[in-house]
From Swiss-Prot:
Site feature: Transition state stabilizer: 16, 23, 260, 359
Gene Ontology MF term list: 2-C-methyl-D-erythritol 2,4-cyclodiphosphate synthase activity; 2-C-methyl-D-erythritol 4-phosphate cytidylyltransferase activity; metal ion binding
Chain intervals for the UniProt region annotation (2-C-methyl-D-erythritol 4-phosphate cytidylyltransferase): 1-227, 1-228
Ligand binding (4-CDP-2-C-methyl-D-erythritol 2-phosphate): 234-236, 260-261, 282-284, 358-361, 365, 368
Required co-factors: a divalent metal cation
Keywords, in A-Z order: Isoprene biosynthesis, Lyase, Metal-binding, Multifunctional enzyme, Nucleotidyltransferase, Transferase
Official protein name in the record: Bifunctional enzyme IspD/IspF
Similarity comment: family membership: In the N-terminal section; belongs to the IspD/TarI cytidylyltransferase family. IspD subfamily. In the C-terminal section; belongs to the IspF family.
Region (2-C-methyl-D-erythritol 2,4-cyclodiphosphate synthase): 228-384
One Pfam family recorded for the sequence: YgbB
Amino acid sequence: MAKVAALIVAAGRGKRFGGDLPKQYQTLGGRPILRHTLARFAAHPDVALVRAIIHPEDRDLYGAAAHGLATLLDAVEGGAERQDSVRLGLESLTDVAPDYVLIHDGARPLVDGALIDRVIAALADHPGAIPALAVADTLKRGAGGMIGQTVDRAGLWRAQTPQGFRYDAILAAHRAQAGTMLTDDAAVLEAAGGAVALVDGAEDNAKITTFADLERAERLFRGEGEQRIGSGFDVHRLGPGDFVTLNGIRIPHSHGLVGHSDADAPMHALTDALLGCLNAGDIGRHFPPSDMRWKGADSAIFLRHAAALITALGGRILNVDITILCEQPKIGPHRARMSARLAEILEISATRVAVKATTTEELGFTGRGEGIAAQATALITLPF
């Protein structure tokens, strides 16, 4: 499978929007616009890497907006113009060398997974692909408040982002076209002789440029929602040690759980359940065991990340349910603390967090005390 990276362009000042706060940090559904945009790509199962390109003065704003989205690459600073910023972003990816790169406006927070799918799919056959909408309105060219000409709209398209490219091709094109001030990245590849395909765009994938655009996005964002159910399952074997960590609670035990992180099986199962609600892959995609950053890591990082993806998409966690399978240790004395800890991480009421336990009647690996297993179910709601 091709390695896909996403560059989120958020280095502009948004002069047409007005105000002191750049538009990408204005709030939509109580969260910064840019956070929603980042989360859409971080949650996509085929996007392996996400990096923002930001203004040098926006480090603190970006840090607050991206807080809790643990899998993002470090942001890079942009240049004087959008084209400069994108080139710098592309250069920053040379060490990871993706096959494809998606370049997206930070102020398009309502991009959906199906549109991203279409762009990625087109790159198998074309060096570039962009989402676009056929022009439906009659077009007029005029000056001084008067119509000078009616323009034939046949074959005209409104370009959107994410604009997708084979990485080597768009990097070479940006290097060759530096300083030419082209209006989008497709134009950069075109100028270098590359072919760019069109795929279906989406009306809701509009760029927020004015306050009226933000009001429209807010109406779409807060529309009637849908419910999603996800499930997760995890197992960790028991080895040397004198405690186990279950749902964030350290419990004395004759053995310890073995794993790359803290081996918190029920919290891992719950993380997978939440990611499943979003069709966002599994915990191993977001936090691969090959990455030493997560060696011995507190699993609350993983769970908080999954919850942040849901919140950034305008969703709410309605309830979660976890069952721990083990003979020992006894879970009952720790159940209330487990529920409270999970509720704290997920920022929901403990009444929405069910923690249960069962034995397997001394059958199987859990019955023999070789490991601990857990299964989890989550119910969330997302706006349409």
